[in-house]
Amino acid sequence: METAPLEAIVKAYGTPCFVFDEAALARRMHAVREIVGERMRLCYSVKANPFLIPAMCGLVETLEVCSPGELEICMALGVRPDAILFSGVNKTWRDVERAMDAGVTRFTCESPLHVRLIDEAAQSRGRVYPVLLRLTAGSQFGMDEADLLAAVA
């Protein structure tokens, strides 16, 4: 970034303000893509910074949302529902239904409750939705081995 444009931004918006170099972001994301190739899909977690959603849409295949608010922001910005992964440990029946109604087709399951919520909502629509089961590594998030095995049984 050049000093002159930054000075103009400070005059226009004051301080503090956040300024992102989208060209630098794109270069870094392309470097990551070169390293991982096409064998992996890149995912941006919206909670990191929702203001970067428009820039990230062209750089990653998936946007992870963890709340109804993040989902609404993505919908308002025109993010394709098939590019959204609905995640989060506090999902409710209403959240899952809203996401499905919006066209979201991929979900994470962090608990046996999430498995039931998503399964019941899918069945009520006569659909099958792919899910990612989150296995805990000893933290408070995710399912332990027994819960995970029960989920796939």
Region spans (language model):
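A charged N-terminal "starter" segment
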Residues: 1-129, 133, 137, 149
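Active-site loop/helix belt of alpha/beta enzymes
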Residues: 137-153
